[in-house]
Regions:
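Short, residue-level hotspots on alpha-helical faces of the histone-fold
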Residues: 38-42, 46
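Short, conserved, surface-exposed binding loops centered on an aromatic residue
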Residues: 1-3, 38, 55
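Catalytic strand-loop segment that frames the active site of acyl-thioester-processing enzymes
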Residues: 1-32
Length: 83
């Protein structure tokens, strides 16, 4: 059952494949904003996946984020969610 307070977390290491250059959202080899959004959605899904009925899923419908600092290759990024 979905309840307020359910939490999720997703982590990944910044690599060339999730960089702004690879995602075509910039030219630098730093963590891309589209990658950050995807990681946030992973955390949100992980928070509720065990509570979803078979065949059900989640869909992101609204994001309001600030990506305020560049994260270089090799650093770990963590996204946390709370329902």
């Amino acid at each position: 059952m979905l309840e307020t307070g359910i939490r999720g977390e997703a982590k990944e290491v910044v690599s060339e494949s999730n960089s702004a250059q690879a995602m075509k959202s910039g030219e630098l080899k730093v963590y891309a904003t589209p990658s950050m959004i995807a990681l946030m959605e992973q955390a949100a899904y992980k928070s509720v996946a065990a509570e979803l009925e078979e065949g059900k899923g989640t869909v992101g419908t609204l994001m309001n984020v600030s990506h305020i600092s560049a994260t270089p290759l090799g650093m770990e990024v963590t996204a946390k969610s709370e329902l």
